[in-house]
């Protein structure tokens, strides 16, 4: 029998997911009860989530976040940051942050900020933020600052979120 080979996309996901997990403590690996129910059925409870295995956790994040988010189409040096953004925010918000970061790299905005990851986004990211990942980190921190302005009760998470954003990738 031929030796089984690991899917290159899955291998790339594992590398980026490991970077995210190393950067921040997430007991359930970013898996939410909603994600668990979508994959395993509506009868899943918080207790099931608390007892999630590392393999199940990885499979869910790969199938529910990595693949539908088309994260592998983005420049390699921003994939871990973008994966983490998708775990913290809704996917559309993560894409908006990415789009604003791309636009911040030049005087003329080059992409629409609409939360839709179109084909041109990866190319635009390659020409801009892949050259300076700090643009994406800064845009993420700006998002958190604006969130605190809108919702002062979020202030308690500021240091944790800011540290998370700047220390990854």
Where in the sequence are the language-model features?
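Cell-wall polysaccharide-cleaving catalytic domain and substrate-binding groove, primarily
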Residues: 1-169
């Amino acid at each position: 029998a031929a030796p089984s080979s690991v899917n290159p996309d899955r291998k790339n996901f594992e590398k980026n997911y490991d970077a995210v997990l190393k950067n921040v403590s997430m007991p359930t690996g970013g898996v939410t009860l909603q994600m668990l129910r979508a994959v395993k059925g509506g009868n899943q409870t918080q207790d099931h989530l608390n007892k999630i295995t590392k393999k199940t956790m990885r499979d869910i994040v790969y199938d529910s976040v990595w693949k539908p988010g088309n994260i592998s189409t983005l420049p390699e040096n921003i994939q871990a940051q973008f994966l983490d953004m998708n775990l913290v925010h809704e996917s559309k918000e993560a894409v908006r942050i990415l789009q604003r970061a791309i636009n911040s790299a030049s005087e003329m905005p080059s992409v629409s900020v609409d939360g839709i990851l179109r084909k041109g986004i990866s190319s635009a990211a390659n020409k801009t933020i892949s050259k300076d990942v700090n643009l994406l980190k800064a845009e993420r921190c700006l998002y958190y600052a604006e969130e605190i302005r809108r919702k002062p009760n979020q202030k308690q998470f500021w240091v944790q979120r800011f540290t998370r954003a700047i220390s990854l990738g």
